[in-house]
């Protein structure tokens, strides 16, 4: 499927937002796991 510039831009925005959300959740999860495990300190 060939996307128009507008469509590919919109798709790219969703991909970037999804990646940001995923990274944010992963960072929070790792931080919580790190603070919840005393043997890492």
From Swiss-Prot:
Residues 37-41 are periplasmic. Keywords: Antenna complex, Bacteriochlorophyll, Cell inner membrane, Cell membrane, Chlorophyll, Chromophore, Light-harvesting polypeptide, Magnesium, Membrane, Metal-binding, Transmembrane, Transmembrane helix. GO terms for cellular component: plasma membrane; plasma membrane light-harvesting complex. The keyword Ribosomal protein does not apply. One of its GO terms (molecular function) is electron transporter, transferring electrons within the cyclic electron transport pathway of photosynthesis activity. InterPro entries: Antenna_a/b, Antenna_beta_CS, Antenna_beta_dom_sf, LHB-1/5, Light-harvesting_complex. It holds the Pfam family LHC. Residues 1-13 are cytoplasmic. One of its GO terms (biological process) is photosynthesis, light reaction. This is Light-harvesting protein B-800/820 beta-2 chain.
């Amino acid at each position: 499927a060939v996307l128009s510039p507008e469509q590919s831009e919109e798709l790219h925005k969703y991909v970037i937002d999804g990646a940001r959300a995923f990274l944010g959740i992963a960072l929070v999860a790792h931080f919580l796991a790190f603070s919840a495990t005393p043997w890492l300190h």
